[in-house]
């Protein structure tokens, strides 16, 4: 959807690109970004689905937008997306993706109606003393100095923020405020993280600021995001004949590099453990998602903790990005993002209640019936005095279509792990 002056151009269908039926696309990974690109290739690019190839190293699509019932582990969600009105690309796409719940409507219709009928807001943003109200009371707690520090960061040139941590630009006037409690737990920021990243988040989500204390700016799906978002996209792509190649790991991309030219020439991949090559031409498009946020994740269980593995997994997205970047500086600097995992990792857990012991505590804190099928916590609840700076949430229940009646499935994460 293209916005210019008014909406004259917004709803017109693109002209079919000349020769598109002779082109092919290879998408490395099957997370939300790759699936979105594939959907746009089908809808707007009008590329035949049989010419679109999604190469995924796992046996299932979705990337970080997961939600799965693992034998012996139970329900697992590694994270969740907090969505708002200004996800323009996503909403433009989902108006064209048919619902898998209701015939004749789109995913966007379904999502919009749900959040109109059951708007999101939190009645308890933070607690202390094991469940008592922390009385953030919708306030930011910022002094004039703190507000000026945030404003100064917003207008600082990017180049002046290279290699600077947040503690170089914010004093205790910000770092001890409610604003920072809201922000850091919502976006998983540590004090030592990048000041430039903080600035970029401020610019991208400035419209969130008014809704930070109670999450009124946010929207959530009915079920976990694999079932509510990824599955409808998969059904749409499969219906158009898009080719999915699971258990297929792209380990390298070779390039034809000359002055004024950078063209992918070959994909090197492992399919079920055997090496293969795909030679590329000028009629082939390649879409990469290097450096995924769950690329190096590891699962624990009821009996053992999730192992911390500081080394990058060989043959993964980060490893591939490093190989590509070594060939040309224009391909970025991945080590800026992955060289200090002890400073960037965090731990999450999916919890399933099997009896009636925990739900009353959830209800007492969030002040809503968690079994109502409506908004429960309305976003994360942060235990302000937790050594982990632990936050937890229960979204609309059930979170999984096959979730047994009487159970709750929630998500917990510790910023300090």
PLM ranges: what are they?
Residues 1-25, 43-51:
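Extreme N-terminal leader/targeting segments of oxidoreductases
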Residues 208-220, 283-285, 290-417:
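C-terminal segments that line or cap access tunnels to active or ligand-binding sites in enzymes
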Residues 42-69:
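Glycine-rich FAD pyrophosphate-binding loop
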